[in-house]
Design a protein with these regions (language model features):
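Long, non-catalytic protein-protein interaction scaffolds
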Residues: 2-200
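Structured, charged N-terminal subsegments at the starts of enzyme catalytic cores
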Residues: 177-263
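Short intrinsically disordered, low-complexity coil segments enriched in acidic
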Residues: 1-2, 263
Length: 263
């Protein structure tokens, strides 16, 4: 009996402090089949084809982010007060070919495996085969890492002595700082302009590298503000057509917030 009570306890806790709106959004997320979403990989490929070789690596990555945030599909689902999705809806999972360029077989495994399945369509497989793999197969970080390792290292890896070491993904860590609560990205851009003004190209051998990094930061902040503005504009368009007074008011609030955040 005691064991049974412990098993049921999370359900009791779940019922407290959860509004109907949050419960509905949570159920929508939990009940949606995760799926691969190819848009990011395609937009990133476009950006690299356009900019690679014309700018520094930091600037290339920043321009890619700006291209992606300017072009990616965005949506706001009813009841959401915090907006933003990785894909076009709940549980749509983008791929990151710059880190790891999956083979078609990899994607078939994702679609067919029993645990943590990601649905993959025939169109996804076609785009991966014809568009993504030809460009990214030998450009990905994972390919570069594995190509640099000794045969002994590869043998140990294949034997499972060690496995995932983030060669297929970014760490995803966030620097512990409260600056984002005090300053917007437009403020950070002012900091960058001052830093660029202070660069000493005559005496500092690192000045050019610093300029490239600062320039990339400036572009990345533009990208983030572009995305925020797009969500604000979408919320305002949706509010103009909404008949539910509460949701209409929420959309206007979202639009007002996105007009100043993250800028």
């Amino acid at each position: 009996m005691a064991v049974q009570e412990r098993v049921q306890e999370p359900r009791v806790q779940e019922a407290h402090g959860v509004t109907e709106r949050v419960r509905r959004l949570r159920e929508e997320s939990l009940n949606t089949q995760p799926r691969i979403y190819m848009e990011r990989a395609l937009l990133e490929t476009e950006a690299y084809e356009q900019y690679e070789g014309t700018v520094s690596v930091p600037e290339l990555r920043a321009l890619t982010l700006r291209h992606y945030f300017s072009k990616k599909s965005i949506s706001i689902h009813k009841g959401e007060l915090i907006v933003g999705e990785k894909g076009d809806g709940p549980q749509s999972a983008p791929t990151f070919p710059e880190l790891c360029c999956h083979t078609v077989e990899d994607m078939k495994v994702m679609d067919q495996r029993e645990l943590i399945r990601f649905a993959v369509t025939e169109e996804d497989l076609r785009l991966q085969q014809e568009r993504v793999i030809p460009f990214w197969e030998k450009r990905s970080i994972r390919h570069r890492i594995l190509s640099s390792m000794s045969e002994e290292w590869k043998a140990a890896y294949e034997c499972g002595i060690f496995t995932e070491f983030m060669e297929q993904r970014g760490p995803g860590h966030t620097v512990g700082s409260d600056k984002i609560y005090q300053k917007g990205f437009a403020d950070y851009q002012e900091d960058i302009r001052r830093a660029m003004k202070d660069l000493d190209f005559l005496r500092d051998p690192e000045a050019l590298r610093k300029k490239e990094e600062l320039s990339a930061m400036m572009i990345a902040y533009d990208a983030i503000m572009i995305l925020g503005k797009r969500y604000g504009e979408l919320a305002r368009r949706m509010a103009a057509e909404e008949t539910d007074p509460q949701w209409r008011a929420d959309l206007f609030t979202i639009a007002e917030n996105c007009a100043v955040v993250p800028a």
